[in-house]
């Protein structure tokens, strides 16, 4: 009978980071939370869509909170403790995503709003008539 041999697999070690940056991009339709280390390499990310919300529910504050908690739990498992928060956009999930990051157990160093403001750039979308 032939002997079966096991192939040795090389496991990739998870790097541990103590501090990082939380990028929260909040649009009118979705909220995307990306957690990176200080050099900008992505450690974890989550969005309202990847957290199981579809359609109009993606733009709710609860969906943003769920996405932020999901990304935070994955980053906490790498040993991250202190974060800076960069918020971009004017969607409804901005504040709740920040509260969810704070509630997950991170020490927040700073919160910055990096929303870009056009100097009369592109024409805005037309007004809705409902």
Curated annotation (Swiss-Prot):
Spell out the InterPro entries in the cross-references.
Ribosomal_uS11, Ribosomal_uS11_bac-type, Ribosomal_uS11_CS, Ribosomal_uS11_sf
List where the protein spans the membrane.
none
- Report the principal subcellular site: plastid
Query: Domain of life, per the record?
Result: Eukaryota
GO terms for MF: rRNA binding; structural constituent of ribosome
Q: Which UniProt keywords are present, listed alphabetically?
A: Chloroplast, Plastid, Ribonucleoprotein, Ribosomal protein, RNA-binding, rRNA-binding
Q: Which GO terms describe its cellular component?
A: chloroplast; ribonucleoprotein complex; ribosome
Give its localization.
Answer: Plastid, Chloroplast
Metal-binding recorded as keyword: no
The UniProt similarity line reads: Belongs to the universal ribosomal protein uS11 family.
Subunit (UniProt): Part of the 30S ribosomal subunit.
- PANTHER family tied to this protein: 40S RIBOSOMAL PROTEIN S14/30S RIBOSOMAL PROTEIN S11
UniProt name for this protein:
Small ribosomal subunit protein uS11c
């Amino acid at each position: 009978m032939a002997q079966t041999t096991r192939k040795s697999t090389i496991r990739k070690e998870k790097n541990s980071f103590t501090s990082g940056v939380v990028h929260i991009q909040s649009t009118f339709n979705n909220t995307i939370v990306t957690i990176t280390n200080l050099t900008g390499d992505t450690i974890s990310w989550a969005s309202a869509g990847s957290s199981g919300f579809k359609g109009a529910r993606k733009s709710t504050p609860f969906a943003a909170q769920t996405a932020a908690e999901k990304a935070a739990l994955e980053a906490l498992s790498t040993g991250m403790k202190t974060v800076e928060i960069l918020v971009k956009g004017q969607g409804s999930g901005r504040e709740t995503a920040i509260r969810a990051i704070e509630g997950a157990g991170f020490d927040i160093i700073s919160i910055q709003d990096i929303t870009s403001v056009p100097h009369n750039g592109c024409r805005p979308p037309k007004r809705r008539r409902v």
